[in-house]
Amino acid sequence: MPLILSLKKRTGVHRKKQRGQSLVEFAISSTVLLLLAMGLIDLSRAFYFSVNLQGAAREGARHGAWFNTAGRYNPYLDDADIMQAVNQSLAGAGITANLVTTSGCLVPTDSNSVGNKPYPQSAYPAASQAVNVYICYTDPNGNKYGSLPSHPTDNAWRLGDVDVALLMNFQLITPFIQGIFGQGIDLAYNEHFTIQGKP
């Protein structure tokens, strides 16, 4: 009889130890899973906004490059019309972009000749979740302009280039990821389109 009681006591103690071990394992694994979930939330949001920036830049450049065959001019090759196309594309994401006009085009930090990223930190908006738009017009002779207030009335821009660049200060929302990357990360996308026209 004493042997049976002794076995029962040992089994009960063993079960209590197992429960404590399971609790520790769950605490460690749930912490790791929670950190992964927070990272996925911010990564998913960043991907969502980068896809919206990409689409808006493409839509703005395509809209500006369009050629009216009957009128023989580019009716949307100006700042206001391109910005309207960009903001219509970004409306679904709940963002409104701001046009930044400059005397010249946005100069990348690696000085590449086509105006692609990376861009200087000063070009990004200071406010979180804000978008700056830079439009660069290159005429057929290679002259670059940072602004075009009104569209051309003829076919002079044919085979030129319009480059629409969108730069965003993306706000991270999970505290742990903010601790790693800071308050936000810079997202940028630009799109070139050849300005259409007929000789």
Predicted features and spans:
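N-terminal leader/signal peptides at the extreme start of proteins
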Residues: M1-R19
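Aliphatic-rich helix starts adjacent to a transmembrane/signal segment
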Residues: K17, Q21-S29, L34-G71
